[in-house]
Amino acid sequence: MTNIKWITLQANWIGYYKDVVSNELCDKIMDYSDNVKQLKASEYATSEGKSERSKERVKMDDGWFVNGEQHYQDIRTCFMDALKKYQEKHKDCVCQRHTDFRLNKYSEGGFMSRHIDNIHHSHGQTYGYPQLTALLMLNDDYEGGNFIIADNEFETAKGSAIVFPSNFMFPHAVK
């Protein structure tokens, strides 16, 4: 039987925010990613580097938006807006640094297996373990691609954001 207090506790730490990214900006980033940006098959990372088990752990393409690149500042502004909303509820949450921004693109049959995001140095982190994960949803015109966090499925809308702690209590996946 599910413990109601546990569900409430989890929900307290998972922030879902609508309309963080405008529809127009979502479309521009998606168009740029489809037609200009070089996405490549994602590789699953561990604390020791790339995993030999990547194909069973993840099937998607990804690419990084780095400072100075087109749309980087737009993405950063939206990220900071989502973070600010999260911090309004969680006053002790402080974000001093962040990595560049990764775009994940799932095609038919794509997935990311259940995992947590607290891997030191896996994606350019140079200041310790990540404290928060923030996801910006750029589209919702697809079937499947269900986002699951802490064993609960979230319905996400284009332009929305989800923010949650990057620790063992919040494993997540895309199915």
Q: What is the predicted role of each segment?
A:
Residues 1-161, 169-175:
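Fe(II)/2-oxoglutarate oxygenase catalytic core
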